[in-house]
Amino acid sequence: MNARTEPEVFDTLAALIAVRAAQWPDKPYLLSPDSGHALTFGALATDAGTLGRSYAAAGLGSGQTVSVYLPNGEQTARLLLGTMACGLVVNPINLLCQPAQLRYILAHSDTRLVFTWPDGEAAIREALREAGLDVPVLVTAPDANSLPALPATHDAASPLPPPQPDAPALLMYTSGTTGTPKGVLLTQRNLVANGTNVSREHCLGPADRVLATLPLYHINGLVVTAIAPLVHGGSVVMPMRFSASAFWQDSARHGCTWLNVVPTIIAYLLNDPHGQAPAGVRFCRSASAALPPEHHRAFEARFGIGVIETMGMTETAAPAFSNPLDPGQRRIGSIGRPSGTRARVLGRDGKPAPDGQVGEIVLQGESVMAGYYKAPDITREAFTHDGWLRTGDLGYRDADGYFYISGRAKELIIKGGENIAPREIDEALLRHPGVLEAAAVGVPDPAYGQEIVAYVVMREAARCDDAALRAHCLRELGRYKTPKEFRFIAELPRGPSGKVQRLKLLNHA
């Protein structure tokens, strides 16, 4: 294991960026493979200062919200980080939002200004018009290397005060697949604390460089690949979007030492027959959804890169659990041990469950959200009476302190009174050589209450039918857990984090 210096402790993004700029003004912080341009630590600090003065001149002040509707790129990172460093609240909007969600988020967030790019301008203007909002829209390119000009309405604007650690910094809306999106409000301290946790957990230092292919409008992409490198003084290689054919080329050309992916990316990389991993990549971290053990083992065997499985959520500013960096201590199938958080499992009686017993995982820690924006009732429901965040994940802890996820409480299949974790069925199907992806759901059944339907994405050129999959599941799962029906689809619906949206599948069940 490579030794690294313990990361310094900061409590605001403004302080963090200022220190790195003074320390390494000319060192590249972010490299853009699409444009070939590099953003240095010094330029990031300068741009943050310029942005703060521009916001003040435009009549915007600390704590007010600015929305960013852009794909990944240098400009996107500059606007997100610079806005938070100025003391304003940034609202990165998911590009997968449907028109009704976009309308809701722009109105609910109390946004005062929107940054977008040419391809997104029409959607933003239409959403603002339908919401009855008169908000300035600034159009820029995701990979632009200079700030867009803001409208100046105040001649003698005072400089914005530096943000305090507990000041709100990020307003990020959940995907809202089961109802109205919820705005997760995270503070300066929340974000920097978890950037520090990531750096410490993976022993990262100034020589490390991450390939960042996850969207910055998702908490994983923002905290793990944009904020953590600020903490440890490393750098980021940020293509505009993920491409299986370019993934390893970008890693090799820019000397990446670690990777940050979701299970979907691992599946695509395994399905690409031409991919070859370069030397120099120390590890790959996988997060945001459970990594099937078969894919975990296959990735390590083929590419020779160890996978660190982690787990987090928007409400915890990304990771809350991580497997150790030391390969000998990692456990395939486990989300690891608490990382920067305290965790326990609660039984049905609301009391801590013994090791090995499944219950709801709850969390406390410095990275846990301040609450949901303008939703005090929902915020109260999200916490236990003594202040533990309810994750909604079912799981258990083993005797060595490692945690395992069984599924989501809302996604649990209850067949004839028997609780069945969908993930168990998914993993059995993934052990079939022709299956690329799978997701099981429970559907209403007059006899059992619920029956099991499995949605399956087959590998290219694979030949398989219902009978073959049923025979496979009978061997792997037994008759009771074998799906009643198999439905073949081109792709599974996923949120920006890569999680399968099972409840969307239910709409088609």
Swiss-Prot record:
InterPro entries the UniProt entry points to: AMP-bd_C (IPR025110), AMP-bd_C_sf (IPR045851), AMP-binding_CS (IPR020845), AMP-dep_synth/lig_dom (IPR000873), ANL_N_sf (IPR042099), Pcs60-like (IPR045310)
Keyword annotations from UniProtKB, A to Z: ATP-binding, Cytoplasm, Ligase, Nucleotide-binding
Entry-linked Gene3D superfamilies: 3.30.300.30, N-terminal domain of ligase-like
GO terms assigned for molecular function: ATP binding; medium-chain fatty acid-CoA ligase activity
EC number: 6.2.1.-
Cellular compartment(s): Cytoplasm
Substrates-to-products reaction catalysed: sulfoacetate + ATP + CoA = sulfoacetyl-CoA + AMP + diphosphate
Phenotype seen when the gene is deleted: Mutants do not grow with sulfoacetate, but can use acetate, taurine, isethionate and sulfoacetaldehyde.
Region (Disordered): 320-340
One GO CC term on file: cytoplasm
Protein induction: Induced by sulfoacetate.
Biological processes per GO annotation: fatty acid metabolic process
Major subcellular location class: cytoplasm
Stated role: Involved in the degradation of sulfoacetate, a widespread natural product. Catalyzes the CoA- and ATP-dependent conversion of sulfoacetate to sulfoacetyl-CoA and AMP.
Family membership: Belongs to the ATP-dependent AMP-binding enzyme family.
Name of this chain's protein: Sulfoacetate--CoA ligase
Organism whose genome encodes this protein: Cupriavidus necator (strain ATCC 17699 / DSM 428 / KCTC 22496 / NCIMB 10442 / H16 / Stanier 337) (Ralstonia eutropha)
Lineage, opening ranks: Bacteria, Pseudomonadati, Pseudomonadota, Betaproteobacteria, Burkholderiales
